[in-house]
């Protein structure tokens, strides 16, 4: 199948797109990949939807902004893809399927017998109508309904990508996005995954709150700051770090309040140290040392995060590009791959990745009208 995958992360930065040819097991070809920055208007609507989601009590009606935001996400995806296809000389009829993750505005893990909640906004029916192609979407809700965490979902793709590169276990793939998650590939058919803690999401929120930009570009603030070890310890006291794996996070699960007394540079340096220590503790939780750690996601562009990871982790730290991977496109590739698995009825979540009782299929496919 030729599939176009889409991903929009919690950083609200861009629509990522990638083309794969896959049967949901192996990858026969990697097509073009790219991104289109979200418009300011779309970002504002999605921020409003996220704020509404954070206030949304269980049992209450869905916030009205969700429907408007879902249409906006679909329209933004279509506009991004139209430009992407034109750039690469492609047409919609070349694709068997589209895979749209949607925009996460809420993710609550199951706790103390209370089931989780997860919301990804995106009007898949509208996208199918605009493109004339079937769209796989809603990848997480079946896992959550079955008692799973609903995240992370990329691990099965991490294995396929590693095999396509000739990599062998034991291997770790670390995605440093808004939240950081790791996939441990121990051996044939043996893999586990979970969210280690915040990635660069808290740094983004901090920089935005201080009116200092959208993110710490190139680690320029963290590079001249000093780590406040007491604040790192306070952040690490969060009960999440005592919970057994598999487990998942939302980027808003941690408060910036402990960082308020710190100067911007010191706060950024402290969050870098916190992210690296949280990842390190995640590796200790697994109790095994991989041959190497392959880092994907936007966090790998921050030299301070990469230096902190190299100092903290027990194995060599490499970037996705060191193995010829497209590090900014891994998530979009993953949802192209998961869309193919959805179409073929193959599982996308597993007991050791989301805590679900058995391997679960996921996603729904909507046909164009």
From Swiss-Prot:
The protein's enzyme class: transferase
Matches recorded under InterPro entries: Anhydro_N_Ac-Mur_kinase (IPR005338), ATPase_NBD (IPR043129)
The reaction(s) this protein catalyses: 1,6-anhydro-N-acetyl-beta-muramate + ATP + H2O = N-acetyl-D-muramate 6-phosphate + ADP + H(+)
Parts forming coiled coils: none
Keyword Transferase: yes
EC number: 2.7.1.170
Entry superkingdom: Bacteria
Any GO BP: peptidoglycan turnover
GO MF entries: ATP binding; kinase activity; phosphotransferase activity, alcohol group as acceptor
Pathway terms, separated by semicolons: Amino-sugar metabolism; 1,6-anhydro-N-acetylmuramate degradation; Cell wall biogenesis; peptidoglycan recycling
Binding positions (ATP): 9-16
Keywords: ATP-binding, Carbohydrate metabolism, Kinase, Nucleotide-binding, Transferase
Family indicated by similarity: Belongs to the anhydro-N-acetylmuramic acid kinase family.
Job of this protein: Catalyzes the specific phosphorylation of 1,6-anhydro-N-acetylmuramic acid (anhMurNAc) with the simultaneous cleavage of the 1,6-anhydro ring, generating MurNAc-6-P. Is required for the utilization of anhMurNAc either imported from the medium or derived from its own cell wall murein, and thus plays a role in cell wall recycling.
NCBIfam families reported for this sequence: PRK09585.1-5 (NF007141)
Protein name: Anhydro-N-acetylmuramic acid kinase
The gene coding this protein: anmK
């Amino acid at each position: 199948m030729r599939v176009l995958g889409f991903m929009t992360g919690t950083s609200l930065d861009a629509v990522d797109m990638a083309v794969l040819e896959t049967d949901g097991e192996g990858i026969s070809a990697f097509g073009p990949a790219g991104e289109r920055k979200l418009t300011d208007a779309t970002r504002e609507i999605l921020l409003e939807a996220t704020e509404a989601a954070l206030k949304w009590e269980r049992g209450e009606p869905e916030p009205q902004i969700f429907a408007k935001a879902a249409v906006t996400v679909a329209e933004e995806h279509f506009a991004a893809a139209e430009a992407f296809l034109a750039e690469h000389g492609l047409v919609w009829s070349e694709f068997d399927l589209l895979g749209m993750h949607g925009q996460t505005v809420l993710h609550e893990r199951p706790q103390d017998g209370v089931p989780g909640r997860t919301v990804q906004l995106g009007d898949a029916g509208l996208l199918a109508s605009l493109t004339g192609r079937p769209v796989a979407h809603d990848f997480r809700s079946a896992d959550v309904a079955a008692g799973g965490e609903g995240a992370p979902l990329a691990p099965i793709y991490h294995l396929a990508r590693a095999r396509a590169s000739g990599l062998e276990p034991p291997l770790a793939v670390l995605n440093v996005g808004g939240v950081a998650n790791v996939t441990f590939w121990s051996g044939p058919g043996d893999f586990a995954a979970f969210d280690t803690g915040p990635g660069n999401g808290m740094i983004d929120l901090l920089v935005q709150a201080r009116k200092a930009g959208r993110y710490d570009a190139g680690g320029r603030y963290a590079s001249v700051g000093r780590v406040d070890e007491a604040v790192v310890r306070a952040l690490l006291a969060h009960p999440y770090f005592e919970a057994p794996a598999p487990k998942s996070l939302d980027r808003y699960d941690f408060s910036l309040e402990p960082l308020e007394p710190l100067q911007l540079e010191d706060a950024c340096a402290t969050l870098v140290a916190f992210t690296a220590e949280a990842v390190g503790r995640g590796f200790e939780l697994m109790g095994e040392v991989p041959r190497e750690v392959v880092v994907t996601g936007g966090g790998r562009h921050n030299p301070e995060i990469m230096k902190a990871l190299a100092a903290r982790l027990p194995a060599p730290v490499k970037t996705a590009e060191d193995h010829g991977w497209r590090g900014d496109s891994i998530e979009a590739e993953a949802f192209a791959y998961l869309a193919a698995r959805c179409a073929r009825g193959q599982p996308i979540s597993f007991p050791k990745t989301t805590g679900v009782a058995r391997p679960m299929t996921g996603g729904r496919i909507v046909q164009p009208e």
